[in-house]
A protein has these predicted regions:
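Structural loop-to-beta junction motif characteristic of Rossmann-like glycosyltransferase folds
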Residues: 10, 72-73, 216-217, 234-242, ...
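Active-site-proximal region of nucleotide-activated glycan assembly enzymes
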Residues: 11, 68-136
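C-terminal alpha-helical cap of glycosyltransferases
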Residues: 301-318
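A short, well-ordered alpha-helix in the C-terminal region of glycosyltransferases
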Residues: 288-302
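Donor-nucleotide binding loops and adjacent catalytic segments primarily
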Residues: 2, 7-8, 135-220, 250-254, ...
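Glycosyltransferases and closely related glycan-assembly transferases
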Residues: 4, 38-53, 59-75, 88-96
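Acidic donor-binding loop of glycosyltransferase active sites
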Residues: 50-51, 213-228, 235-236
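Conserved nucleotide-sugar phosphate-binding/catalytic loop shared by glycosyltransferases and other
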Residues: 1-32, 39, 121-124, 267-269
Length: 318
């Protein structure tokens, strides 16, 4: 986030908000949460916002709660197919809920918790610059000819070690299917693995749009933001959600699209065995691959950011 915001006219403020987890943080929560609320109060008094936009997460709770006490309207945004704990708590204090995935479970929970809340299916905002890439740019970055299918494994800036290990363990089989682009995550490259048709990089920012445009099949985690961007791209996609014990919402995000036959979903515990066969099936024909991408594209909401911005502006003017 820090790298993404660098150079943009957005003021970033840190707040020491506690997480409601186990261990020492749970013991200290009764002490730390009031301090976080006091910190939030000072920030809100200084900035005097007309409206507060909360995306969920532990940082949003003290700010939104104090904002409600100060009679500032709270607008929530829920990215995922199931509502997070912070947003569930903040519903009763909020005026408007924007939902990224139009799931009945999210809507019903909002209605049951707060009968006065207004609900709008806005979609999830995307980085529109990701849609500006080209095949020529991808060829330039990777050195690939583009004559073979392009397989992209994209674990995000933090990387996904399970994805990395599966790629390294089945690289020979993947290279039988096409050229492989592997974004490992910061500091997770294996520099001793080299091949003319294997492009390995930890993180790409400026050139990421070209890599995405160049890819025929993309393998990714199932975070809501990634899914929104992949839907906008309309690429054939394989999702590998985090296990339920880590993040249940990724499983739900992926399941929602799997039911619609818009993505292929693989379990990370058996990824080494299933990754290559899944990609082989997608690449079985151009029609098969394109239809999968087209079905995912039907879930794209390219103007999600504008929809949310309009709600914020309308609320602020009231």
């Amino acid at each position: 986030d820090r790298a993404f915001l660098r150079g943009k006219k957005i003021e970033k403020i840190s707040i020491l908000a506690p997480k409601l987890t186990g261990g020492i943080e749970l013991i200290l929560f009764p002490l730390l949460f009031p301090l976080a609320c006091l910190h939030a109060l000072l920030i809100l008094i200084w900035f005097r916002p007309h409206v507060i936009f909360a995306k969920g997460g532990y940082v949003s709770v003290p700010v939104a709660l104090v904002g409600w006490i100060l009679r500032r309207p709270i607008i929530l945004h829920e990215s995922d197919s199931i509502m997070g704990r912070a947003n569930r708590f903040l519903l009763r204090f909020s005026r408007h809920l924007c939902i990224g995935a139009p799931q009945k479970e999210v809507t019903n929970e909002a209605i049951m918790t707060s009968t006065k809340i207004e609900i709008t299916a806005t979609g999830n905002p995307i980085r529109k610059e990701l849609l500006t890439g080209s095949d020529d740019g991808g060829r330039r970055v990777t050195g690939f000819s583009g004559k073979k299918p392009i397989i992209l494994i994209w674990g995000g800036s933090q990387g996904a070690q399970t994805l990395n290990e599966a790629v390294w363990g089945s690289l020979e089989q993947l290279l039988d299917l096409g050229d492989v682009i592997h974004l490992t995550g910061r500091g997770k490259q294996k520099k001793n693995i080299t091949h003319a048709r294997y492009f390995q990089q930890d993180v790409l920012y400026k050139e990421l749009p070209n890599i995405l445009a160049f890819a025929d099949v993309i393998v990714s985690r199932a975070g809501a933001g990634s899914i929104a961007e992949l839907a906008a791209l309309g690429k054939a996609t394989v999702l590998v959600p985090l296990p339920v014990k880590v993040q249940k919402h990724q499983q739900e995000n992926a399941h929602f699209l799997e039911i619609a036959n818009a993505v292929v979903v693989l379990d990370q515990d058996s990824l080494q065995e299933t990754l290559t066969p899944a990609i082989r099936e997608i690449l079985r024909s151009d029609t098969n691959r394109q239809e999968l991408g087209s079905r995912l594209h039907t879930f794209a909401v390219p103007d999600a950011a504008e929809r949310i911005a309009n709600i914020l502006l309308e609320t602020a003017r009231r």
